[in-house]
Design a protein with these regions (language model features):
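Sequence-level detector for tyrosine residue identity
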Residues: 12, 34, 69, 80, ...
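Short catalytic/binding micro-motifs of nucleotide second-messenger systems
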Residues: 12, 53-58, 90-100
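Conserved long alpha-helical elements within nucleotide-processing catalytic cores of c-di-GMP signaling
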Residues: 1-10, 14-24, 28-52, 62-65, ...
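Short, intrinsically disordered/low-complexity patches at protein termini
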Residues: 38-39, 85-88, 94-96, 104-106
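A short glycine-enriched loop-to-beta-strand structural element that forms part of the catalytic core
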Residues: 21, 59-74, 97-117
């Protein structure tokens, strides 16, 4: 699924000459030995909900791994990226009241020439 989203995003940037922002949200257990997969899956569903209610209709999200979601922000100005990530983080922590996980994220940009920044 990730490959399809990335290919779509790459074609989009070439065709429309717009930049995309990639945000990779990662769920991190506070205890390195944490192994409750069912609880982790529930928390990932919570993250999915937080992302869905926080994105615009044109933006895309896809599950990247058992602990990660990739968000593709289409033609989002640099100064608004923190607004979106803050909204997702706030939504997540309002819904998730547990103490086993924290949420982190990394941002990359796909330029019009398809290079990553």
């Amino acid at each position: 699924e990730f490959e399809q989203v990335f290919e779509l995003a790459s074609r989009f940037t070439k065709r429309n000459e717009q930049e995309l922002q990639l945000v990779l949200f990662t769920l991190l257990p506070l205890d390195d030995d944490y192994k409750d997969v069912l609880v982790q899956e529930e928390v990932m569903m919570t993250l999915s909900e937080a992302i869905q209610i926080s994105l615009r209709r044109v933006d895309i999200s896809v599950r990247f791994s058992s602990t990660q979601y990739l968000v593709v922000l289409i033609d989002t100005k640099q100064e608004y990226i923190s607004v979106v990530t803050d909204r997702i983080m706030q939504s997540f922590y309002m819904m998730y009241r547990g103490k086993d996980f924290v949420l982190d994220y990394d941002i990359a940009k796909i330029r019009k020439n398809n290079s990553l920044e």
